[in-house]
Design a protein with these regions (language model features):
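Non-catalytic terminal regions of proteins
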Residues: 1-6, 16-18, 22-233
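Flexible, glycine/charged-enriched surface loops at secondary-structure junctions
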Residues: 11-15
Length: 233
């Protein structure tokens, strides 16, 4: 369950899930004496499921990269046992908006234009992390989503979604909490633009064409004739 917070907000792949699991387990238990992370990796490797964007197939490479503490966000409300109140959510939303607006490139958000809409924040929620040694860390998981038009090399445009999962922590990479200063610890992106966005657009176009949803596809090709069920022997 911890791994779900380490997934990109859109177009999740099995490779993304493996990276999320390895990252979550490394956060929870850096030593991993039982070999849980190695078992996950071996199970995925045997099934030929490998992440496309990892530098190599090692624990260090599969973990999402952590960020330094040079880009503080400011003070965010922690909330109580029942989460954030309405006022705290409004305050958090405003602080996040200001941070995102000032750091769009850092968060790998595409520039707004004719084919790309403005970003939205569909959800954010506080997390209290307790690792195996009993250390506690407060974090905030934020989903940022953009909608744009995919324009592959051939065919017409179609809607695509991109975005970033931002995990904000009270701990810097040095491991110490700093009062009133919180930092982006992970930026897990599925951008709309650049080579990754273009590759996803081509894959999505091919999928839609196969389903017959593109102008050069044939929807009837995949239509099932249920009348044939009554024509058996």
């Amino acid at each position: 369950m911890r791994a779900l917070d380490y997934l990109p907000p859109v177009d999740v792949t099995f490779g993304d899930f493996l990276r999320a699991v390895i990252t979550a387990e490394t956060d929870h238990d850096p030593v991993d004496e039982e070999g849980i992370r190695r078992a996950w990796m071996e199970a995925f490797r045997l099934r030929g499921i490998l992440p496309d964007d990892a530098p190599s197939f090692s624990e260090e490479a599969l973990c999402w990269p952590t960020l330094g503490d040079a880009l503080p966000i400011g003070k965010l409300p922690y909330g109580g046992p029942l989460g954030l109140s309405y006022e705290e959510r409004e305050q958090t939303h405003q602080i996040l908006r200001e941070f995102i607006d000032q750091n769009r490139a850092f968060l790998r958000l595409a520039p707004v234009g004719e084919d790309v809409g403005e970003y939205q924040i569909p959800s954010f929620h506080p997390l209290v992390r307790v690792n195996r040694a009993g250390s506690i860390r407060w974090e905030l998981a934020v989903e940022i989503v953009q909608t744009g038009k995919g324009r592959p090399n051939r065919g017409t445009s179609f809607l695509m979604r991109g975005g970033t999962t931002l995990i904000v922590s009270t701990h810097s990479t040095a491991g110490g909490a700093v009062e009133d200063r919180m930092f982006p610890r992970f930026v897990i992106a599925k951008p709309l633009d650049g080579p990754p966005g273009e590759a996803r657009a081509e894959l999505q176009r091919a999928h839609l064409e196969e389903l017959g949803y593109m102008p050069d596809g044939d929807p009837a090709r995949y239509r099932i004739n249920f009348a044939l069920l009554h024509g058996g022997d």
